[in-house]
Amino acid sequence: MKKEIASHLLEIGAVFLQPNDPFTWSSGIKSPIYCDNRLTLSYPKVRQAIAAGLEELIKEHFSTVEVIAGTATAGIAHAAWVSDRMDLPMCYVRSKAKGHGKGNQIEGKAEKGQKVVVVEDLISTGGSAITCVEALREAGCEVLGIVSIFTYELESGKEKLEAANVASYSLSDYSALTEVAAEKGMIGQAETKKLQEWRKNPANEAWITA
């Protein structure tokens, strides 16, 4: 499953690998990888594979789920497809409450005591997913965990999720992606080394000259 999804993401250009010409994230971190899972929306076969995979993860790890919650905005469409497949209610959670109208942060119904699974497109530092989890907990929901399409497998993300006491499972990850990219001849040995060094410590730019 991990390598299959990784292959899909590479084929449609949802993930770019540029170890010799790094991207700069909004945080200022230089990165050899850029992930835009919104592109999956434009590929029916890919998004169907993702929805099926997320459903499988939820059934395996969070079988008592009652509500599917998407993170705004990238997780909303995937949450909708998964909730439809599972015949479950769905809501989505904003990064912060609206400044007008009812001032909702949670759109749709997620009631006190209900068991919720969060659908996220990408786990990097875990920040947006944790914000979603906290909003649902404040509303009295029991958050069973998070499922996502892809994770960078960053230690900082793992630590934040553990600190928030929330389980998280991804369809694919950085390790599988770099392995598939190497198998496809998209990166060579030198590039693979740079990618591996970056994941160990993204804040240390020594990987660029590794």
From Swiss-Prot:
Keywords, ordered alphabetically: Glycosyltransferase, Magnesium, Pyrimidine biosynthesis, Transferase
Recorded catalytic reaction(s): these are:
orotidine 5'-phosphate + diphosphate = orotate + 5-phospho-alpha-D-ribose 1-diphosphate
Q: Which cofactor does it need?
A: Mg(2+)
Which InterPro entries has this protein been placed in? Answer: OPRT, Or_phspho_trans_dom, PRibTrfase_dom, PRTase-like
The EC number of this protein is 2.4.2.10
User: Disulfide connectivity?
Assistant: none
Q: Which GO terms describe its molecular function?
A: magnesium ion binding; orotate phosphoribosyltransferase activity
**Highest rank taxon of the organism:** Bacteria
| Positions that bind orotate | S124
Describe the task this protein carries out.
Catalyzes the transfer of a ribosyl phosphate group from 5-phosphoribose 1-diphosphate to orotate, leading to the formation of orotidine monophosphate (OMP).
On subunit structure and binding partners, the annotation says: Homodimer.
Q: Which HAMAP family match?
A: PyrE
Which NCBIfam families is this protein grouped with?
pyrE
Name of the molecule in the record: Orotate phosphoribosyltransferase
